[in-house]
Amino acid sequence: MVQLNQNFINTIAQELPAHLSMDDFIAACSRPLRRSIRVNTLKTSSEDFKRLMQPKGWTFEPIPWCEDGFWISYDEEEQLGNALEHIQGLFYIQEASSMLPPTALFTPNADWQCVLDLASAPGSKTTQMAALMNNQGLLVANEYSASRVKVLHANVLRMGASHCALTHFDGRVFGEYLYESFDAVLIDAPCGGEGTVRKDADALKSWSLDEVIEISETQKALIESAFLALKPGGSLVYSTCTLNRHENQGVCEYLQQTYGDAVQFESLSQLFDGAEKATTPEGFLHVWPQIYDSEGFFVAKLTKTRSVPRLQPEPKLQKNFPFTEASAKQAKAIQAYFADDLGIELPDDLIMVRDDEFWLFPHEFRDFIGKMRFQRIGVKLADHSKHGFKVRHEAIIALAGKALKAGAKNGAKVVEVSDEQAKEYLMGRDIPLDTAGKAQGEVIVCYGGAPLGMAKHLGNKLKNSLPRDLVKDKVLLLPPQA
């Protein structure tokens, strides 16, 4: 049973729009959330994914504000996170309302090349934006919590997002270190989580207005930092999964009061069919749970109309960046290895070298070298030794899919496996082959045309090369439905 604190109810009763009823709000908070997922278009299309899953009993209801988002229903009670298709990165389990902020930032005419996600983990919005950018440009994903950075990186890797750079900082430093550097910024701010009560019945049990006001002060500092990091003419989206005005409208009003006409609010009333039901007088989206039968959420969009003064002197550039750009000879060698041995044509990105490691960075990252310390940049392609190159798993996941999808295998050694074999592979086991043949060495293991990783073809079996930290204890095969 959902626990709604009486002080919270009293506060919401004063803020709830006149056309909505408190009884409907409480009833909506008491209902379980509908299951929702987002198809990962970096690896598949929504139509192909539906064709794959409908025989397994899935039904799909489109989410109005996300072209590749769906409410789903199916008979299985198992955890979807263990599903083979989820481990492959074909979809992300994402609450419908949380798909709103990237949609608001990436309206049809947006062509953002440098984007900041200020509070990224676990990665739902980061990977949604990576898909909207189609792995072009640069997406800087920041997370303050060290443990959550690991989760963020795992999801970025699983979804094949190759143009991300991960950072681990308090979001309040970005306005200083990366002043007016980004075309667009998303800040899904840490918040009181009032909108999440449908999946966490105790979320509001100890709610207090004092805590709300304390959180809002942090949010004001974060939105100001995000605004300072935004280029003039750029767009900023501020969102929370909470419902009170202090953390939502109040934070946006603070920014406008601080920077005046440099802050121009943009109306989201036409963002999707039905958006007007949740639009505030300022043009923000205040999604109460009963409006769309979803989590409660808040989304605001603004444009930075002009440059504003920085608050701190420009920091000195950091020295000793550990990567150097590959020489023409090095670049040619790694390109030939990927093309000849793997059938993968490397994208026209920056090939970088650190010791014996070869990496692929977005070109846009050049402008950020020395300005801030990054935890992870782009994709690690391969290690080099006297025996030659050894491809890295993340490169196969991020880059092989496009080659296979286009049918451009170019003589690559690819082994397509069954669902049972895919399960065994993801659990770290070797795969016996029905017919013994000539050993082929390193091969790309695929299921349903999408790469799972690498293996060594020994003639009578595939010797598993999946990194140990990616081995699963359980893999769920969703059965066909009668």
From Swiss-Prot:
Key words, A-Z: Cytoplasm, Methyltransferase, RNA-binding, rRNA processing, S-adenosyl-L-methionine, Transferase
EC numbers on record: 2.1.1.178
UniProt: S-adenosyl-L-methionine binding residues: A119, S120, A121, P122, G123, S124, K125, E143, D170, D188
Example of a GO MF term: RNA binding
GO cellular component: cytoplasm
Origin superkingdom: Bacteria
Principal subcellular localisation of the protein: cytoplasm
Active site per database record: C241
GO BP annotations, alphabetical order: rRNA base methylation
Free-text function comment from the UniProt entry: Specifically methylates the cytosine at position 1407 (m5C1407) of 16S rRNA.
Family of the protein in this entry: Belongs to the class I-like SAM-binding methyltransferase superfamily. RsmB/NOP family.
Name of this chain's protein: Ribosomal RNA small subunit methyltransferase F
Source organism of the structure: Shewanella sp. (strain ANA-3)
